[in-house]
Amino acid sequence: MASYPCHQHASAFDQAARSRGHSNRRTALRPRRQQEATEVRLEQKMPTLLRVYIDGPHGMGKTTTTQLLVALGSRDDIVYVPEPMTYWQVLGASETIANIYTTQHRLDQGEISAGDAAVVMTSAQITMGMPYAVTDAVLAPHVGGEAGSSHAPPPALTLIFDRHPIAALLCYPAARYLMGSMTPQAVLAFVALIPPTLPGTNIVLGALPEDRHIDRLAKRQRPGERLDLAMLAAIRRVYGLLANTVRYLQGGGSWWEDWGQLSGTAVPPQGAEPQSNAGPRPHIGDTLFTLFRAPELLAPNGDLYNVFAWALDVLAKRLRPMHVFILDYDQSPAGCRDALLQLTSGMVQTHVTTPGSIPTICDLARTFAREMGEAN
């Protein structure tokens, strides 16, 4: 692609850089490599941690399933990190969820402009994303390399998170873009803020027939929520695209090589259930990248402005390392719990980085739950 020379010439640049001073650096690098090897051996003796992020569209039964799973373990070896409802409703702002739904309703009724709605939605999503992003940053220093999943002993600690940072920093902004209440520029601004993906990031997405999903959502009571079927369709579509995007990237897909295969229109808010890693690599048109071939992001020659291309590079870098699992929610709560438990046997653990990491992580998770877990 003519507008992205950095991709075309990266290998030549790297080759030239390596050729300068190579012999001088060889000796200097040897002690560093020995130190790194020692650090790896020490890390492999550390306890292991399993992190599971239960994510997907709202109203499927994620929280119920997670709480049932957590109840199977002891208080010391499995810890639940809930949605930060108190932060959303009290600490970070007042009634953020109600504000989001009211703003979308007013836009749909023609009471406010798309621009006015976008200002409110962007501010609200900052509030929604902050607890996830900062918690990820505090946790990161304690997460070491991946320990693998085959024949691994039980982890010293299992953390079950109610959502990953990408929910608030990617999926819900993208759905609001499909709903007309957020700009594509704002969505990519959130993408740029997604924290680097830690090793052993296991994300569980959900599958549930749409009619069953609507029925479950209609029966639950969450502060400030409205039954918005258009938004439900949009967020279901986005999570389907997310699963496809991870498969596309892990299968060797390159957005900048395949960009020309995209049409000039964003996908409609409808689509199939998320799929597991089985099957052929998805077409780029069935991934999140298709959302960003939008006129607002294109230069006069029809190519993406480089700043937006860089944001898509960030998106690819964040999603590629994720371990994605699909949970069938079309069963009883106990059945969902058992299916989730079975999925965990194939998930990837990590070593922690210090002898004190496990109690520190436990304290972090329980502090989060105590301070932000339930609205007062």
From Swiss-Prot:
Further facts: Phosphorylates and thereby activates certain drugs like acyclovir (ACV), valacyclovir, and famciclovir to a toxic form, that leads to successful suppression of the infection, while the uninfected cell does not have this ability because it lacks TK. Mutations in thymidine kinase may induce HSV resistance to antiviral therapies in immunocompromised patients. The most frequently observed resistant strains are unable to express TK and are avirulent in animal models of disease.
A Pfam family of this chain: Herpes_TK
Applied use: Used in molecular biology as a selectable marker to identify transfected eukaryotic cells. Used in cancer suicide gene therapy to selectively kill transformed cells.
Active site positions: E83 (proton acceptor)
GO terms, molecular function: ATP binding; thymidine kinase activity
Catalytic activity from the UniProt record: thymidine + ATP = dTMP + ADP + H(+)
Protein name as annotated: Thymidine kinase
Keyword DNA damage annotated: no
Keyword Acyltransferase: no
UniProt keywords, alphabetically: ATP-binding, DNA synthesis, Early protein, Kinase, Nucleotide-binding, Transferase
Oligomer and partners: Homodimer.
Function summary: Catalyzes the transfer of the gamma-phospho group of ATP to thymidine to generate dTMP in the salvage pathway of pyrimidine synthesis. The dTMP serves as a substrate for DNA polymerase during viral DNA replication. Allows the virus to be reactivated and to grow in non-proliferative cells lacking a high concentration of phosphorylated nucleic acid precursors.
Gene3D superfamilies: P-loop containing nucleotide triphosphate hydrolases
Species of the source: Human herpesvirus 1 (strain CL101) (HHV-1)
One Gene Ontology term from the biological process aspect of the record: TMP biosynthetic process
Family: Belongs to the herpesviridae thymidine kinase family.
EC numbers, comma separated: 2.7.1.21
UniProt-annotated stretches for the region Disordered: 1-39
Highest taxon, organism lineage: Viruses
Record-linked InterPro entries: Herpes_TK, P-loop_NTPase
Residues that coordinate or bind substrate: Y101, Q125, R222
Record-listed ATP binding positions: G56, P57, H58, G59, M60, G61, K62, T63, R216
Record field: compositional bias (Basic residues): 19-32
